[in-house]
Amino acid sequence: KSSLRELWRDDQARLFTYFIFTSMLAYSAQDLILEPFAGVVYHFTPGQTTQLSGTLHASVLVGMLLLAFIGSAWVKGRLGKISTWMVSGCVLSALGMLALCWSGLSASDNHLMALSPLLLILGLGNGLFSIAAISTMMQLSTQIKPLGDQTPSAVKPGLKMGLWGAAQAVAFGLGGLLGTAASDLALRLMANRADAYAVVFALESLVFLSAAFMAWRVKKINAAEVGQVGYPDTTEKSPQQLTLNAI
C-alpha cells in the first residue's frame, strides 16, 4: 500500500494512468455502436455493417504495423518520437469521430464508400495511439527515480504495469457500457436518429481530445525529466531496448 501511495504521488505516473483510462474508454465506447449506427442511419444490411467492422479492424492493424516501423531500430526516431505519435493517434481518432458525426448528419442510404474512408482514419488513429501507449508504458515502467522518501528501487516496474493494466481493463469494460447507454439515451431523447448518433460521436471525439492533451502532458513531463531519471544498467542492448530509444 505504501508503494502504491508513493507511486500515485508521481505526477507522470498518475497522469499516464488517467491517459490510459481515458483513451481506452473512448476506444471501447465506439466499438459497439458503429454497426447499429450504420444500420439505423445508413440503412445498411447486416452483411454491410460486418464489412465496415472489418475495415475498421484492418485499419487498426495497419496503424499498429506503421507504429512498429516508426519505432524500429532501423528508423531510429527519424519519423518522430513514439510519444509524439501517441498524441497524434489520439488526435487522429478524434478527427475520425468528428468525421463520423458529420457523415451521419449528411447520410445517404446504402452509401458504403461514404463510411469506409472515415473508418480508415479512425482505425489508423486507434492503432497508432494504442501501440504507442504500450511502448510508452514499457519505457516509463523501467524509469528509476526517487518517489518521496523511498529509494529509487522501492517502486517496482510490476507495480506500475499493474496499475496501468488495471486502468486499461476497467476502462475497456466501462467504455462499452457507457457507449451503448449514451446512444440509447440519445435515441430516446432525440427524434432524429442521425442527430442522436452525432451527439454521441461528438462526445467521444472530446474524450479522445482529452486523452491527447494528457498524452502531451506526459510527453512534456518526460522531456523535462531527461537526465534526472535512469534505467536499469545492461551490458547489451536488446532489440526491444533499441526500439525504446526512439521514444
Residue ranges, per PLM feature:
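A membrane-interface helix-boundary motif in multi-pass transporters
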Residues: 81-82, 181-207
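Short amphipathic helix-loop junctions that connect adjacent transmembrane helices
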Residues: 32-51, 184
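Multi-pass alpha-helical transporter architecture, strongest
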Residues: 101-104, 197-239, 244-247
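Helix-to-loop junctions at the C-terminal end of transmembrane segments
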Residues: 63-84, 183, 187
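Pair of pore-lining "gating" transmembrane helices in MFS-fold secondary transporters
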Residues: 8-33
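C-terminal ends and interior cores of transmembrane alpha-helices
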Residues: 88-109
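Juxtamembrane intracellular "pre-TM" segments in multi-pass secondary transporters
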Residues: 1-17, 41, 230-247
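Intracellular juxtamembrane helix-capping segments at the cytosolic ends
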Residues: 128-152
